[in-house]
Structures are given as C-alpha cells and as structure tokens.
C-alpha cells in the first residue's frame, strides 16, 4: 500500500514537472548545443568522447570552479567572508597542492577515466541526442547520485579518521588546516580511490546517457570545491538546497579534524551526532557576532 502511494506521488510530481516544462519558453541555446553535440558525434569516436571528453570536462571545470576562490585572496572586500581569517592562503601551499593535483588527476584519475568507454559499452549507455534526458530528469538523477555519494562518503570518511589508519591515508588531505578550493581533490592516492568509489556507485545505478556522467561530474565538482573554498558567501545559491552542508560546515572539520564527515548534506552527521561540536561552536560564534553588532 505504501509502495503504491509512493509511486502515485512520484508519478504526480513527474507529471507536474512535465507540465511546467511544457509552459517554459524554448531554450535559445538548445539548437546550438544540439548542433555542437551532433558535430562531436560525427567527428569523434565513442572512445575519444568518453575518454578525452571526460578528461577535458573534469580538468576544465575543476580549475574553472577554483578560479573565484583563487581570486578572492586578492580582493580586500572578500576577506570579511573568509572563515579562518588568521590563516590566509600562501603561494607555497597552493603550489604544493597544484603539483599533487596534477599527479592525482593524470596518474590516478585518468586511468579510471580511460575505463569510461568500456563502462558505457557494457551498460549500453547511449550518446545520441535523441535519447538525451530532459533537464529535470538529469537534475533528479544528479540529486540521486549526490545522496548516494554523500552516504558513502560519510561512513568511509569517518572510517579514514580512525586513529589506526588516519596517519597513513587521510592525514594528507588535512595538511592544510584552512582549506581552499583547489585543495578539494588534494589527497592520498588511496583516498582518491576509496572516497571516489561513492561517485561511481551513483553512476552505475542511475546513469542512462553519457551527458548524465558529465552533468554529475559538474555537480560534484561545484559542491566539493564550494565546501573547501574557505569562504562563506551570503548569496551563495547552493545555500537554497535543503540540508546542504556548505563551506562553514566542512571548514570546521578541517579546523578541528573531527565531526562533520558528510560531503554534501547534513543529515548523517545529525543522525549520528557527529555535528555536536560544530553546533556548539556555531552557537558560540553567532553569540559573539551579535555582541559585536
């Protein structure tokens, strides 16, 4: 009975979204995007698209999303939004981070990316324009991937903080007590594989078009770079997402090496009480801010 009701609610919601979508004006960028997509399909093999296309998407978007946070350090106005004001970014740390990123991206992640083509072939995932999902379907599936990844990340991240293994793997990610955007993927190669598995579980369960793979890469990069940015920007649109953790939530984890283990949402930390110290810190911070007003 409950299952039937859930299906009925889901179907009604889907119909409502489809109706709203039908009322929206035609996207002027759709035709150019369609032409570009078909040009890609006609001029490159599936292996080239899945391998080199995925690499380009990841590298271009990663450093593009890191750019605002990188520029903030040169803008005096943005300093008031920096969470750990007493720990500014240094060129030494950023250069060290960049070198490790290049190693991780091309020696660890790229070999995994090379398997994308075989993944899409094995699961018969299409590339063509005609089967590309509508925007709301892609958004819903990306949200599903985020929930799956967040769950995996919470429990495995918490395990990596166990005193018997922390110093061997996860300690590298905590070298910088005040995080910055580029540090999001600064990690031990084993951590890249362990926590990165959560990214692929969602893809294996929910991906039905290669564009969804790239969409999920985009969403995940936006999220992880944002929470590592070190800045709490008031008008950040990501704060509109229910239960979104955000930069201040994750910054506390880097500041104190404990609690707030989830990557995207707050519910697992809330359920298991691993946000208790953060909540106490946050209340104290808010009271201090009120006194200074």
From Swiss-Prot:
One Gene Ontology term, aspect cellular component: endoplasmic reticulum membrane
Record's keyword terms, sorted: Cholesterol biosynthesis, Cholesterol metabolism, Endoplasmic reticulum, Iron, Lipid biosynthesis, Lipid metabolism, Membrane, NAD, Oxidoreductase, Steroid biosynthesis, Steroid metabolism, Sterol biosynthesis, Sterol metabolism, Transmembrane, Transmembrane helix, Ubl conjugation
InterPro entries, sorted: Fatty_acid_hydroxylase, Sterol_Desaturase_Related
Keyword Thylakoid: no
GO function term, MF aspect, one: iron ion binding
Alphabetized PANTHER family for the sequence: STEROL DESATURASE
Location(s), subcellular: Endoplasmic reticulum membrane
Organism: Sus scrofa
Domain notes: The histidine box domains may contain the active site and/or be involved in metal ion binding.
Catalysis performed (reactions): 4,4-dimethyl-5alpha-cholest-7-en-3beta-ol + 6 Fe(II)-[cytochrome b5] + 3 O2 + 5 H(+) = 4alpha-carboxy-4beta-methyl-5alpha-cholest-7-ene-3beta-ol + 6 Fe(III)-[cytochrome b5] + 4 H2O; 4,4-dimethyl-5alpha-cholesta-8,24-dien-3beta-ol + 6 Fe(II)-[cytochrome b5] + 3 O2 + 5 H(+) = 4beta-methylzymosterol-4alpha-carboxylate + 6 Fe(III)-[cytochrome b5] + 4 H2O; 4alpha-methylzymosterol + 6 Fe(II)-[cytochrome b5] + 3 O2 + 5 H(+) = 4alpha-carboxyzymosterol + 6 Fe(III)-[cytochrome b5] + 4 H2O; 4alpha-methyl-5alpha-cholest-7-en-3beta-ol + 6 Fe(II)-[cytochrome b5] + 3 O2 + 5 H(+) = 4alpha-carboxy-5alpha-cholest-7-en-3beta-ol + 6 Fe(III)-[cytochrome b5] + 4 H2O
Protein name: Methylsterol monooxygenase 1
